[in-house]
Amino acid sequence: MEITFQKVEHRYQYKTPFERRALYDVDVSFPSGGYYAIIGHTGSGKSTMIQHLNGLLQPTNGTVQIGEHFISAGKKEKKLKLLRKKVGVVFQFPEHQLFEETVEKDICFGPTNFGVSEEAAKQKAREAIELVGLEPDLLARSPFELSGGQMRRVAIAGVLAMEPEVLVLDEPTAGLDPKGQNELMEMFYKLHKEKGLTVILVTHNMEDAAKYAEQIIVMHKGTVFLQGSAEEVFSHADELEKIGVDLPMSLKYKRAIEEKFGISIPKATLSLEDLTHEVVQVLRKGGHESCSS
């Protein structure tokens, strides 16, 4: 299900003294089945943008097309409920939205709200709990007895139980330790590959953006500043830093090595493994002479 933004503008508190423009002139497409990252400094428009993906917000101007659904200024999409089933959104700290007596009831809430029978919803809950790497015996427990990481996975299972075609992730690893962050990101990537889900990730973690995303959209002051592959986007390191966007640690180390040893590493290195390989290649080609001078 392809998603397209066409000249999208959004203003909060439109036509009031408190009006504030959050998005303008946003033209971007998310072809079906891809993995995308949206990055940018705080306040750049990332969260406002993704709230247009399932009709939580409506453009002030322009059009958002999500498959066969069109959302535009002044026109209400009649099938928002169906759209929200197709586009699952995992907001920051989704575990705060858990409320039922048991894990099973919490996961079943979405499917039953969309008209699925109780028996079918329970089957979806069993499948979803396994998709997020938890044991089915947790279904009978209260979600509030679980660890923070388990609660987050339960909340994500509730989104997956509705079988979305698009999974939107707004800082999904916020507050987790490094091990938990890595496990969750690997889980999302596995779902993307095995289920063919379109994934749209909003993140401040540049390592995650570089590692997982096929395309990266850089937002700045409410519009698209840069778009391309990780290699293309992070080749504009100086420009990104000027607008407050962090760089992957491998690029920071690359700069430090170049400055320290007076060598040039031409390739954009997006992982420490890439950086190690490129440093070895440069030294083999004679870069070590620069190091010793």
Curated annotation (Swiss-Prot):
Keywords, ordered alphabetically: ATP-binding, Cell membrane, Membrane, Nucleotide-binding, Translocase, Transport
Keyword set includes ATP-binding: yes
Subcellular location: Cell membrane
CDD domains noted in UniProt: ABC_cobalt_CbiO_domain1
GO cellular component terms given for this protein: ATP-binding cassette (ABC) transporter complex
Chain positions recorded as ATP binding sites: G40, H41, T42, G43, S44, G45, K46, S47
Highest taxon in the source lineage: Bacteria
EC annotation from Swiss-Prot or TrEMBL: 7.-.-.-
Pfam families on file: ABC_tran (PF00005)
Enzyme class, first EC level, given as a word: translocase
Transmembrane spans: none
Bilayer disposition of the protein: Peripheral membrane protein
Function of the protein: ATP-binding (A) component of a common energy-coupling factor (ECF) ABC-transporter complex. Unlike classic ABC transporters this ECF transporter provides the energy necessary to transport a number of different substrates.
Assembly and interaction partners: Forms a stable energy-coupling factor (ECF) transporter complex composed of 2 membrane-embedded substrate-binding proteins (S component), 2 ATP-binding proteins (A component) and 2 transmembrane proteins (T component).
Family: Belongs to the ABC transporter superfamily. Energy-coupling factor EcfA family.
Protein name, per record: Energy-coupling factor transporter ATP-binding protein EcfA2
Organism encoding this protein: Bacillus cereus (strain ZK / E33L)
Species classification: Bacteria, Bacillati, Bacillota, Bacilli, Bacillales
Gene: ecfA2
